[in-house]
């Protein structure tokens, strides 16, 4: 007589049948493994070389080996694949024009942390209709990343969990940890194992110490629970990431992109730290996208005067300016090339901002020659 199955029909071990477990879980759906998705949507040789080049350039800039400025620019979040690819083609052309002064990486954010609730990004809800088809979201995200990098444009993204990078990180050149998660041990551990530079934003209250601490923590080896490329739970051991840096994004205490704030930030950084990046949006724009060019003017003045600590900037930009709510009819009712999360500057303004920034870099070279 054969033994009875160890697991009940609902998948729970029989020894736990009396336990109150998963009482708030409504259900589980199968999730494709990272390995399967990477086989189904393989990276092209051009895509992989683009990702590697973007990483090398970013590392050289934040460590002071390259005197250009690293620029992370693009939509607050991507919801429209066609618009994202049109934006990328425009940005690639501008990147080629300004490559002597700027190393441009497209901001390609697919997951959004929310203060309370709201649309959480292309991976979580690709159809923007609360169907949460995450498998479709991962497929769309990977195909988009292959397409963007295949035109020779490096991309950067926000890191929100320890699972999604397994699907996409081979195509990424830059990672960001947001203000809400900089203090999280999980995200510091994640950053310690990523194969590209990672920027930690200062806290939402404007304090810098959490980002400085995060960089130091991520530089060390860590051990934590994760998943393998085949989707198997595993203990992950990381090497440590020495290419982490602080992003100044402002906060409740005010902005922190001016010369005084930059000097104070420099004073807080331990010896040997990587350079600073300034986020033109969020607290530094007082959440008004029209202030981003004003932030750029102040940053350009500092760079033109010889400030070498500013090694990067982050800009929220789209084809068309502003943002929009999600209408009742969903994606069909959305305006083309307009953000559905944070408001962004439009393309024409983006060109002006980046050309001014490139000119400031050229002026810094002249100042530093003296």
UniProtKB/Swiss-Prot annotation:
It catalyses: D-erythrose 4-phosphate + phosphoenolpyruvate + H2O = 7-phospho-2-dehydro-3-deoxy-D-arabino-heptonate + phosphate. The modification N-acetylserine is found at residue 2. The keyword 4Fe-4S does not apply. Induction: By amino acid starvation. GO terms for cellular component: cytoplasm; nucleus. Inhibited by tyrosine. GO terms for biological process: amino acid biosynthetic process; aromatic amino acid family biosynthetic process; chorismate biosynthetic process. It comes from the Eukaryota. Keywords: Acetylation, Amino-acid biosynthesis, Aromatic amino acid biosynthesis, Stress response, Transferase. Belongs to the class-I DAHP synthase family. SUPFAM superfamilies: Aldolase. Its EC number is 2.5.1.54. The keyword Transferase applies. This is Phospho-2-dehydro-3-deoxyheptonate aldolase, tyrosine-inhibited. Pathway: Metabolic intermediate biosynthesis; chorismate biosynthesis; chorismate from D-erythrose 4-phosphate and phosphoenolpyruvate: step 1/7. Stereospecific condensation of phosphoenolpyruvate (PEP) and D-erythrose-4-phosphate (E4P) giving rise to 3-deoxy-D-arabino-heptulosonate-7-phosphate (DAHP). One of its GO terms (molecular function) is 3-deoxy-7-phosphoheptulonate synthase activity. It comes from Saccharomyces cerevisiae (strain ATCC 204508 / S288c). Present with 26300 molecules/cell in log phase SD medium. NCBIfam families: aroFGH (TIGR00034), PRK12755.1 (NF009395).
